[in-house]
Design a protein with these regions (language model features):
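Bacterial Sec-dependent N-terminal signal peptides
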Residues: 1-27
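Accessory carbohydrate-binding/adhesion or oligomerization-edge regions at the termini
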Residues: 23-88, 163-165, 171, 532, ...
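N-terminal carbohydrate-binding accessory modules
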Residues: 29-34, 205-208, 264, 276-339, ...
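Short strand-turn-strand beta-turns centered on an Asx-Gly dipeptide
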Residues: 131-137, 237, 280-281, 303
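Extended acidic/polar, glycine-enriched regions
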Residues: 155-159, 222-296
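Substrate-binding/catalytic cleft of secreted carbohydrate-active enzymes
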Residues: 220, 333-335, 345-591
Length: 595
């Protein structure tokens, strides 16, 4: 009997190890265009400060079976947390919490015969383990990109128990690492869905205008399985374009369409076309725009015309709520203020933001710069960190490669030159270009210095030559004093390439008045002067092709210690945490309206 029990345990263990690849899968393209069942709502939760939950197997969700049974945990009748949302903003006790919280909920699965079922997470911050009906089925690291797990053979029609172990502890090998200038939100911060597909489904596609040609659309579609000689139809009805093709041995088709009637997407006219992709068993629809973007010399060309990028940055945060933005309504709040400022581009700082923001930005006519949080302090010599970064970059590009608004893939922010850093960033660039060669590669540097001998601003980082566009963060008048008057500031940075000032500005407490030439006044008057000086300097940068003030809204940050002027907020916003526009906002509005 003992031998039989042991054999049973071994077989059970082998099944559990082989039934699931514990590394979560990269998400299928366009989850929001699939058949979905939402798992959003109130979830039960357990705060696990000492990380005892896994050791005690609380994911089994056991209940007493006899008079002597008891368990020192229960998901029911305790803490309940909203999903999607961060946990920090839901309870005062969790405001600064860094550690593990377990989420749990029951669900039934609606699955037609022959269908496959996937569990989709828009993002979980920062690392997580997923358990279904007592079995660990996946792990994922990275707080800003989607992932999925196939649960077709593990799910029951009724009474499934899903547990998610979430941990947001900062670590040296994480991305971002130990210190970063925004709030360390933890939790299931984006949508959770059950996604139903046919047995063989349309897994991935990439439909975009050629990088240069205005009349050529390139399309690549891949099935979920390596199935040859299967028919795939691609159609753009408004352009009267339609092709049916046979898959190769990899289950893929590649083709091109030619049309002289394509109206190209631009910030002034954000035209999108309905694209239909179908097989015998599956069909998916998507709105896709078509545009060309390239660099020539010191200029950036959109649809063949040189463009000046009137940008702004914001965090994925609703300051009035002091929490993560996660809904379409939140996207409207953030993007409407960017539109009011007169922007034609947004730098989504400093991580991939949710799909509602990306898709809404495209419809509203914003170009986008998207990046993963390679933000200072990254351990560039750690191979594990490098692998994580590559995976995050791949997940970001895969999710948003069909968004024509995406113009720039950002690969770094404020990093120090070294061979390990260069190798690390080259790995990210290669990851991007393996998926998508149509976008421009950009990075933001903070190494511009004033050369007293030449009386010129210069930057010593040869890596700029490996980028399509160079960006600079420079806080003159705030972290750096003015070595010359703004009208005498001469720049010799990234000569021969387009240059964007990707961050500038300073802090001001809304409503506070003070001396306009004293930084420590923390006043709107000083912030206004600072902006005037920077805008004057910009006139004298010959290859300047865009500006992006830091930042649209005040945002939460434990970096910021001043008890009266900051109180845990970075006050560089043009708009206060309560939604009021500061004096500098009106300066930028005038500047953008006249560019």
């Amino acid at each position: 009997m003992i031998k039989l029990i042991n054999l049973s345990l071994v077989l059970s263990l082998l099944f559990s190890l082989t039934a699931f690849n514990l590394i979560a899968q990269q998400n299928m393209t366009n989850v929001y265009g699939r058949r979905m069942q939402s798992l959003n709502g109130k979830w039960d939760a357990i705060v696990d400060l000492y990380d005892q939950g896994r050791k005690n197997k609380i994911y089994l969700n056991k209940k007493p079976e006899n008079k002597t049974d008891f368990y020192e945990y229960a998901f029911e009748n305790g803490l309940r947390l909203n999903v999607p949302s961060d946990w920090n903003s839901q309870m005062p006790e969790l405001k600064y919490y860094e550690g593990t919280i377990w989420y749990g909920r029951k669900f039934g699965a609606v699955k037609a015969s022959g269908d496959r079922l996937f569990l989709h997470f828009g993002a979980v911050s920062y690392r997580c383990r997923i358990y279904l009906n007592g079995q660990e089925i996946a792990q994922h690291e990275g707080g800003f990109t989607p992932f999925q797990i196939e649960i077709t053979d593990a799910v029951k029609e009724n009474d499934n128990f899903l547990a998610v172990e979430v941990n947001n502890t900062r670590r040296v090998d994480a991305i971002p690492a130990m210190a970063f200038d925004w709030w360390n939100y933890g939790g299931i911060t984006r949508d959770v869905f059950l996604v139903s597909t046919p047995k063989i489904f349309i897994d991935d596609y990439f439909v975009q205008l050629d990088k240069i040609k205005a009349d050529k659309i390139n399309a690549h579609v891949k099935l979920s399985d390596k199935l040859a000689n299967s028919s795939i139809t691609i159609e753009i009805p408004e352009l009267r374009l339609k092709q049916t093709l046979k898959t190769n041995a990899q289950g893929e088709v590649k083709t091109s369409f030619i049309s002289k009637e394509i109206k190209r997407w631009s910030p002034a006219a954000p035209k999108l076309y309905k694209v239909k992709i179908s097989t015998q068993d599956d069909q998916i629809e998507e709105e896709i725009g078509f545009r060309n973007i390239w660099v020539k010399g010191e200029d950036i060309f959109l649809n063949g015309e040189a463009i000046f990028l009137k940008s702004i940055s914001f965090h994925e945060e609703i300051p009035q709520r002091k929490g993560r933005a996660f809904s379409q309504a939140d996207a409207v709040v953030l993007l409407s203020e960017a539109k009011a400022l007169g922007c034609n581009m947004i730098r989504l700082a400093h991580y991939p933001q949710n799909e509602y923001i990306v898709r809404m930005a495209e419809k509203m006519g914003f170009l986008l710069w998207e990046e993963i949080p390679i933000w200072q302090g990254i351990d560039f010599e750690n191979e594990s960190t490098k692998e994580k970064a590559g995976k995050m970059m791949g997940e970001m590009v895969a999710r948003d490669k069909n968004r024509c608004a995406l113009a720039f893939w950002g690969v770094a922010n404020e990093t120090q030159p070294s061979e390990p850093r260069n190798a690390f960033i080259r790995h990210l660039i290669a990851t991007c270009r393996a998926i998508d060669t149509s976008r421009l590669i950009i990075a933001a540097f903070d190494l511009v210095r004033f050369n007293k001998e030449k009386q010129t601003f210069v930057m010593d980082d040869p890596f700029t030559k490996e980028l399509d566009v160079v960006a600079v963060n420079k806080y003159l008048g705030w972290y750096h004093s003015w070595p010359v008057s703004p009208d005498k500031a001469v720049w010799d940075v990234a000569k021969g390439q387009p240059l964007i000032i990707s961050e500038f500005g300073g802090e001001a407490l809304y409503g506070k008045t003070g001396e306009k030439d004293v930084a420590s006044s923390w006043s709107e008057d000083y912030q206004e002067t600072l902006y005037k000086n920077n805008l004057e300097m910009f006139k004298h940068i010959p290859n300047l092709r865009g500006t992006s003030p830091w930042v649209l809204f005040d945002f939460r940050s434990p970096f910021r210690f001043h008890p009266t002027n900051q109180d845990g907020w970075n006050r560089k916003g043009l708009i206060s945490d309560q939604g009021y526009r500061k004096k500098a906002w009106f300066l930028m509005k005038h500047y953008y309206d006249n560019k």
